[in-house]
């Protein structure tokens, strides 16, 4: 970044913002880059601001029992805030004084007041000086207040982030990631732009008092008629606002439902295509969209009338102020025009400035209170460890994740019992729990000596991870003692990769040791992977390591833990994503040899690992089932395998239910606090559905559980969670993106958090931060790929993983709205900022406007209709003004009249009443025409939005994966959330406002041109100057806004990344380093935002300067060229003031329209995406004249002989696959054939291309070559017909929000009897029957009430229903409990006995059932043989299979031993002094 010219700028340059000219010039000529942005001054750095506020907040905490954050903010920013407030007030006062001088100028033209004619020129100079002073006061004041707001936001951003890193895990379990993002985005952004309005809470009343005093001088008591009307108007607008909020609240649930389905579709787009569900998903989403649009139209109409009321209230304000006085005493034209000018200022103060200021204070204080509550939450406390001990001891330890479960329910019962009058659907109250206070660990005892290996085993949900968390201090024991050294290293179950290089991820801030580093790389089998990268271990890994395979991420995470020298290593299932051979080698070389002298606790379920362990601890439902050696285990616990694997009395479903349903229901209905909230608020927070969908949804909270752990639900009054919650005051459609995506360039949108299914949907779905930390990094990342496909790994679908801490058991899409890495290096930031924005120009093109107008034919006619009505309004205005300027004037001739009454007066005799009759008639006509002329426009623009949404949805569903792979899920979802919200809500009203303002300006210019042609001549160059200035500024401002939006994403990405790796961060003590990274991300955003604010103020000030010059010209032209007659001068000067203020507004509105039209550009870009599918060759009918057999794939009534595929024979010839057109080949020249009914196993190391091959079979990639099924080539039939030949069970199970029936049969092709029959076959009937409604039970949030095994069975049922002859299975047993795995094996043998099965699997026992094996190495087929031949040769399969398995297969063979591995000596321990910086 460059040094800012602001540092050396003069006072004049700072006052007029001239120091921004270099960046404006550069932005106009070329595209701006990050390197062009100026560095921020030190006073704006996050380090300084956060330190300042943190110091004051600590002081507040120390000095008071009830600390207030607002006091800390006041001590930091109050005096500067008030300083600029005074300047703002003085600027507003000049607006009130201007009409006085205008009145004097008009009065000087009265024929009876010729002595003042000589001073008219001086009055004109004074009026112009007032405009100059106002400009010089207002703009620096507004900029200063924006600057203070920015500093407050930065300081609180930092404070919140630092607090987040200190929060206890129990607190994190109760806070959703959506709440945190809302806290940082929704609430804090109120300070950025709202602070300038805050002063109007006291300025506006003073302004009104001053104006009413001045108007009283003119009109006496009748002045209050106009004020009364304005107050009534403000109340009317408030009523309309409440009505609009009611419609928006109703609409919120519909938008939520649509975005839930849309987000699930986007995250699982590969599965949608594999199942051929494109049409079903499109129909489902469009049905929800129809309901949503009905409410959208109602809200838009109300908002339209609200906006129109302000535009057309001016007639009545002036009319009601003037009419009573005129009827009683008569009135002079000077008073009319002066009153008009006063009323313009008064209307703005009463109906806009004061309500906005009150709302700003309300929102800001609410935000401060939420942040204050958050900052006072319980912090993580490191346990007091004995640093001299060498052993690890637990004595009678018991722990709860939920602190005081029993107390929580007792409190809930008490609160509900106190509300005996409540009934109905208000909330849910739980009773009859046998789960009260269930500990996650109970009475745990063990002791291991230094250098020993403890293997911790147990079924899913037994408490293995909780045990490690307790040792780390994340989970505090409620009873018992823990003793060990504080030098801990930790490897999480789900690998966490921070943005940075591979080397940085492994070293992780520990001092670099070349020998140690190389030894760890070798032991973790990373040498070969690193050698494939051009940059070796210096390759920059993006967000979450998305360019790496799951196995590569797991090995890097393990290497990080091993590299740190510690006394105790905690390894939580580190081998979950590794193939059998790699796992075996790493366990031997790394865990057993490299770390031989270290104390290790390994969570595992592998028998080979238990045999090698010094001690074994088996957990069952939180209790210690066994502790001892392996030999003791065999003697004392012969049934240990059932407890270990979960095949006996352990209920997999109930364990998951304990951790997901109970906690989720607690979160959903927030039974922690006391404050009652309305049902609508509860509905917003709980993501509850409405209508028929919602009625079913009520039942979905229940869970089929075994009889021991049932609970009942009673309807009671709701409770609300204390502390932070989602901003229920913010209408949903204004929250439609968690974080603006990197393309966003809106100049007018408040930067608030809005739904995007990443954290936005999470905000609605109450995804806890603890769940975020314990969830698979693979989730949702299949679409999150960069363009460089060479290092990309695709699986058939990303994996879904569950742990005992998976509190909500919901799919997680945190990446969808957070697209940019927080890496700080500027060059790396360019990499991370990649998005599809390059093809969207900085300024919206005319082609986009033309295309938008022609989307709906009616829009052109509506625009013509608006123009016709406008011409009628101009004609009516001319009539009124002609009457005012040319009314016959009479002199009452009474010498006793006051001086005011000696002026020319509009006499109120009967002969002159016609003036007011005509005025009222014209005003009513204009009001009626103005009110209704925009309705057809708003209605038609919403229809255009509906059409564009439909086209975009269709395009995304039909787009090839090669195109979707280059897009980020967040970018796609933002099109459907934020951009569609803009098209629905903001764009129609903004276009209406712009057209309205433009027509007002044109009409006023037309009137002035008739009255004074000289002024028209002066107007033309001014308008030209405005247009040129707008074009000049727009080029730079949109680019700066773009960069600012991009700079915002790393902030939120860094927050989510930090939360995902929080346990690792704390274990390694890297919080200060990540705070530094966060501050750098904040500083980067600040540099862009500050520059944008500065250039915006430069533009606004230049507009004001042009206006001042124009007004000076108009004033002197009218004074020098007008002869007698005050009417003409009054009209000209009043209209001149209105023309320029309205023209300024129109120019700003045009910038807003251009910004919003960028959303339209992005939507068009998605609509223009290519569609997938190659042109098919023509197929010839059979000899009997029937249609081609490939056309009757779905027809169950056709004779079996004609159904395709009939056998499942598959021939692959020279198959080559690529992720993108023209990219590197990821599979090359694959050729083999499969006989009907044969089972083929895919073998290969992690990342070799096994899952990619399955994707290629489904034509999800760019492919070359040919595949035939039963003699039919894939080129001869459509894509849909080809994919329907396959049944698919992907890695990541796709369960969308809907009923069981919809999930199994979305096209509604099968009867209930057939569905139940299949459910019986796959073992799902007993599960489905336990739910209310059975097949009609609504699954939500990725099927959170189902275990992972049940979800896999759902996929199996889909394949059985599809009658597919070829079944593709991609890691079906990954993270499955053995019960579900055995059901899948049995179903495969029975239901798919005659089908061709292609299996990609890591479990040896599953692979042994295959007849043929396809071995893939380096993207090519190395072997394709039977199991006998592979065992005879030195193959991967032979190395992977254990001798015992070989004996089981072929007892008559002697299993040969594997090649000995190179010895790796254990690392010597480092001294105490060398590891001080890594200690907790």
Curated annotation (Swiss-Prot):
Extracellular side: 99-122, 217-222, 320-339, 880-918, 1012-1013, 1117-1130
GO cellular component: apical plasma membrane; cell surface; chloride channel complex; cytosol; early endosome; early endosome membrane; endoplasmic reticulum membrane; membrane
TM ranges: 78-98, 123-146, 196-216, 223-243, 299-319, 340-358, 859-879, 919-939, 991-1011, 1014-1034, 1096-1116, 1131-1151
Topology class, membrane: Multi-pass membrane protein
Gene3D superfamilies per the UniProt record, alphabetical: ABC transporter type 1, transmembrane domain, P-loop containing nucleotide triphosphate hydrolases
Modification type Phosphothreonine: residues: 717
Protein residues bound to ATP 1: 401, 434, 458-465, 493
Catalytic activity: ATP + H2O + closed Cl(-) channel = ADP + phosphate + open Cl(-) channel; chloride(in) = chloride(out); hydrogencarbonate(in) = hydrogencarbonate(out); ATP + H2O = ADP + phosphate + H(+)
Ranges where the ABC transmembrane type-1 domain occurs: 81-365, 859-1155
Residues that hold ATP 2 according to the record: 1219, 1244-1251
Span list, region Disordered: 1452-1480
Localization of this protein: Apical cell membrane; Early endosome membrane; Cell membrane; Recycling endosome membrane
Extent of motif PDZ-binding: 1478-1480
Any Pfam family: ABC_membrane
UniProt-annotated glycosylation sites, renumbered to this chain: 894, 900
EC number of this enzyme: 5.6.1.6
S-palmitoyl cysteine: lipidated positions: 524, 1395
Matches recorded under PANTHER family: ATP-BINDING CASSETTE SUB-FAMILY C, CYSTIC FIBROSIS TRANSMEMBRANE CONDUCTANCE REGULATOR
Role played: Epithelial ion channel that plays an important role in the regulation of epithelial ion and water transport and fluid homeostasis. Mediates the transport of chloride ions across the cell membrane. Possesses an intrinsic ATPase activity and utilizes ATP to gate its channel; the passive flow of anions through the channel is gated by cycles of ATP binding and hydrolysis by the ATP-binding domains. The ion channel is also permeable to HCO(3)(-); selectivity depends on the extracellular chloride concentration.
Protein name: Cystic fibrosis transmembrane conductance regulator
Lineage, broadest ranks: Eukaryota, Metazoa, Chordata, Craniata, Vertebrata
